[in-house]
Amino acid sequence: MASKYSVTLAAEDGYSAAFRGFAEAAEQMQENIRGHQAELRELNRLGRQMDGYQSLQGDLAATAAALDDAREKQARLSREMREAEEPSRRLQNEYDKATATVAGLSAEHRSQSNELDRLQGSLEEAGVDLSRFADEQRRIEEATRQTNSVLEDQRARMQAVSDAQARVTAAEGRVAANREARSQLRGEMVETLALGYLASRPMNSAMDMETSMADVAKVISFAEGEREQYANANLRLASDRLIASSGIRGTDIADIQYAAGQSGIFNEMEGQERFDGVMEFTRQAAIMAAAFDVSAGDAGSAMVSWRQGMNLDGDQALQLADATNHLGNNFNTTAADLTELLVRQGSVATTAGLSAEQAAALGAAFLNPGTQREVAATGFKNFILRINQGAATTDKRREQWNALGFEPEELARRMQVEAPTVIREVLQAIRAAPADEQSAITETLFGTESIGAISPLLVNLDAVDKAFNEVSDTARYSGSMLREAEGVADTSRTTWNVXTAEVARLVTQVGNGMLPVFEAVAPPVTAVIGYMADFTEANTELVGALAAGAAGLVAVKAAVLGVRYASLLIGQVGNQGALMRARLDQRTAQTALAADGAVGRLNAAINRLGGGAAGGGRNQRGNGSAAAGAAGAAGAAGAAGAAGAAGAAGAASRAAPGVQNGWRAWAANVGNSRAGQVAGKVALPVALTAGAIGVANAVGGGDAADVGSTAGGLVGGMGGFGGLMRQQMALGEEFVFSLGSGFPYSSLQRRSDGGWIEIDITYASPSSQNTGQALEQIRLSGTAFYAAGMQRLDELRAMQSERRPYVLVDGLGNNLGRWKIMSVEEQQTRVIDDGTAMKVAWVLQLEEFVDDAASSDDDSG
């Protein structure tokens, strides 16, 4: 198809150039008319001269006759005078009068003779054969009539050009009107899409909230109406300034409730009591998320882990959150990192004898040097566990503990009573050892993976004392998290977030009212779209894309607008076609005028050369007619398209019959070869493009013969290309894969196996061995629809049962050889109540057929 587009673009460029040259062609035509008018005036002048010449000849003849009569009378009177010897006065007077008359007539005769000679010279210069004056006079009259006829034809051509221009203007007006209509329709589409978007926003918000609460319902058994109660409370909670500062939405708050429900903390509660407990937990976790700059889901999970892992109630968890926030503000760490460490190892610390706040303090000390969270958490765990190991301590560690002055059992006991003191003493004892032994002691007691977390503590034991001191008094950190959240909430961004949350609540409530309507409208629309999607999937060559619009009335309006827009596009195609035809008519009229003008100028030039011999003049005029005939014949050949090209080839072969058997036979051999076929397909779009450019150039030059020949070649080439494009894949003579036959294929896979295998060799690389090229395989697949396509499947099976090979020809007319039908597979779907399958996916497996005994030219099948 790419070649076809190239030709079309070139042709359109030619028409555009023709339209732009309309003014120049009209001006040239006016110039031609002025030339013909000048020639007509010249012919009229010659006619008047010939009329004067003929009249003067008559006057000259009358003058000569009168002169003869006067001379005869003079002679007679002279004789009478001589006879009378004494002429009378009367006779003398008459004689004098006759003499004067003779003198006057002689002068007039000389004048008329001179004028006659001048006219004869002028006419001879104009090519008038005075030896055949009557014929020349008739020729001039005929030329004058023909010139007048040409002028009338030119006026008609001018009118045709004007009509063509009017059609072009009308077509352009229709194009502009269509464009304006499509622009207006696009505006309606944008408006509809905007309405659809505005309508979808509430439904999307409502569906998002509905989905989030459906997840919560998996872990909390809601009674009737409770899901909506929780959802509404979440939307209101999202607009709380302490929570809105972090941009938490109602769906995010549902993640906190999911964590609470999954933990089972509120499973023993029912109704309003559970609602109050869950919402209080949710509010605390949401404030924690805003203060700690973590997600709502992570804050909820952390709260649950603290309460379950460290056996805390709600107030204790809130107190731990305050301590964590306070430590994060006073140490080189963040509340979020410390929260994660406590989620991982908080239960280990409280089991070993630390309170939740003391565990947070020790965690802050481990994180303070900038230690990574994972390393600090590992060192924290190993440090607490090994100190609290007691009698389970290994001999090697016991020996090391004794060297430091500790008994493992005593350490474990004291940890349950005075854990911070024991931790300080252990760290001080390790620090008191020689510097080169501290790492070895740490590795022996707590493991290699703990060195990176414990060694920084030995350098700065004051940080440990400071951490424990920060949580020793509740007054120091109580309410720290709430104050942090209030500080973040006191910003314009929070005000904006509150307004956004309220708008989201309104939009969600509107969407809740729209969802029942959507649920009623969506199923039938979805069923139709599903069938269209199946059809699109099976007919990708016909359908480019299928888009579903919004639900309800918006979807219906979008569909109507789509149909209207498509009809306008189709109408625009018609308008463009009319515009192209009008421009072509205009260019055709201009070409005809140019051709007529060229022929007229040729005849006039030949006629002006007619001053020579009569025979020569006729020969030259005959040649002019032949030229005109040649131009007309060329134009006819151009209109005939390929026939003109064929006629030219035939003329060439007749002109040189000896050459025909040479180059034509050679060309036939090359054209029938494989290389010739490939070259022909490659050269076809190039030739069509060149032909379109040639037509445009010929039209611009005004050469009728050139226009006819180039246009004929182009039309013939396009006809050949159209014939090529009409070919379709066929298997044998019976079966064609096409839309028209109800059985198109959607994909073709061709496999060629080179026959290489690898042979394993002991203690060496494998060896490649070629066992001979395997037979090629082709796999065709597509979708057949009820009921014509299923009949074609039966035809394929009937061909398979004949157990013979078939010739396969592709869509470009290439013979792919003979192939065996190995299998015909089908899968029936969309089965309706009576068992009829509305859709059948099929696969045809072909394998190359090789018969050494058969002739290579045998393509039957």
From Swiss-Prot:
Keyword annotations from UniProtKB, A to Z: Coiled coil, Viral release from host cell, Viral tail assembly
Record flagged with keyword Coiled coil: yes
InterPro entries found in the cross-reference section: Myoviridae_GpU, Phage_tape_meas
GO biological process, one term: viral tail assembly
Chain's role: Serves as a base for tail tube protein polymerization and acts as a template for tail length determination.
Family: Belongs to the P2likevirus tape measure protein family.
Record's protein name: Probable tape measure protein
